Structure formats: structure tokens, C-alpha cells
């Protein structure tokens, strides 16, 4: 019986979540639909520098130092850029808090059960950094530990919605990424992000 249960759980882990009706069907990124746009996208004049050239020109980010210390995809933020990044993190956390989110500071490593709880495992195991000695995983997003705060918990309807926000460093192997989409600050192995997460009743509209 235990083997049958284990076999069934292994199969269930391969079944994805059911998307909402408004999610378009598609095989790749070309099927994505723009839901909302804001502001005006400027037309850059001929000869404009790419962001990675600007970062190097003004000594804001040093990619070579990151390679020296760790490897590609781990940039070193310097001076004004380091302060700007810190200010952005505080700004987004403060704005989320004003909108009713409770700030939490989760661990940056999770156990296997947490990875399974949010679907990173087993599907994306090859994209995660794994500390074999302790069988722990560096988080790819704060969504993983924050969601698992509520794993195996029964939440009463009158407790909803539950809104959390969290800042964290994020770690992704990005195996298979290459070309123009990995230049500069694109497709990094380590980056910072503010995550918002809401637990809502199924009858509430998604936002």
C-alpha cells in the first residue's frame, strides 16, 4: 500500500496546476499576450549604448569581478548602483506594505519538501543550486519559502485574504540560456527581487 501511495504521489507531481480561463494557450513565448502597459517607451537615437555598456562606462556594475570571485552571472554592484538597488528594494517593500501586505524575511535555502510544495521539484531541479551535504536548495524566488509558510496548514475562509511580501536574493542556474538574452543584467544566476503573494478565495478575481 505504501509503495502504491508513493507511486501515485510521483505521478501527481508531474501534473501542473490548472491555469485560469483567461490564460491563453500556447507552446512558447510567442503566444504571450500583453495584459497591461504603462508609460511611453522612448525611441532611442542611433548610437545609443546598451545597458551593459552604460554600466561599464560609469563603473556601476563589474561583471569581470563577479567572474573572478564566483563565475559568470554573478555581477558586483558598485557605488551608486549598489545604493540604487538597496533603495529600490526598500521602495517596493514599503509600497507593498501600504497596500496591505505583511513583510516577511524568509530563509534563502529550503528543504526538499518546500521545493516540492511549490512545484520547483522535481520539474526544475536542474535549475536550482543544491547543497548536497545538507540536501537544501538555494531559493529561485521568495515565493518558495513564503508559500511554504502555509504548507500543511488549514486556513479558515474568514482569514482570507492573506497578503505577504518579501525581499530576497534569488539563485537560478539558468541552464540552457544563451545568446542576446543573457547579456548584462539579463538571466543572472543571482539577483535581488521583491515578491508579493496573496492567498485569496477562489471566487475572488485575480489581479
Provide a role label for each language-model segment.
Residues 1-42, 60, 64:
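N-terminal alpha-helical targeting/anchoring segments
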Amino acid at each position: 500500500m505504501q509503495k502504491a501511495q508513493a507511486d501515485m504521489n510521483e505521478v501527481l507531481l508531474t501534473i501542473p496546476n490548472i491555469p485560469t480561463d483567461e490564460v491563453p494557450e500556447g507552446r512558447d513565448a510567442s503566444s504571450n499576450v500583453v495584459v497591461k502597459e504603462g508609460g511611453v517607451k522612448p525611441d532611442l537615437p542611433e548610437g545609443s549604448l546598451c545597458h551593459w555598456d552604460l554600466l561599464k562606462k560609469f563603473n556601476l556594475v563589474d561583471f569581470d569581478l563577479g567572474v573572478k570571485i564566483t563565475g559568470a552571472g554573478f555581477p558586483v554592484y558598485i557605488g551608486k548602483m549598489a545604493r540604487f538597488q538597496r533603495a529600490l528594494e526598500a521602495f517596493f517593500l514599503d509600497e507593498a506594505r501600504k497596500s496591505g501586505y505583511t513583510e516577511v524575511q524568509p530563509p534563502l535555502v529550503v528543504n526538499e519538501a518546500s521545493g516540492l510544495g511549490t512545484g520547483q521539484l522535481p520539474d526544475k531541479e536542474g535549475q536550482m543550486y543544491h547543497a548536497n551535504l545538507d540536501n537544501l536548495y538555494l531559493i529561485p524566488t521568495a515565493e518558495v519559502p513564503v508559500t511554504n509558510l502555509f504548507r500543511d496548514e488549514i486556513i479558515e475562509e474568514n482569514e482570507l485574504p492573506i497578503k505577504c511580501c518579501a525581499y530576497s536574493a534569488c539563485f537560478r542556474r539558468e541552464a540552457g540560456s544563451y545568446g542576446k538574452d543573457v547579456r548584462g543584467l539579463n538571466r543572472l544566476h543571482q539577483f535581488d527581487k521583491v515578491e508579493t503573494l496573496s492567498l485569496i478565495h477562489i471566487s475572488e478575481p485575480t489581479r
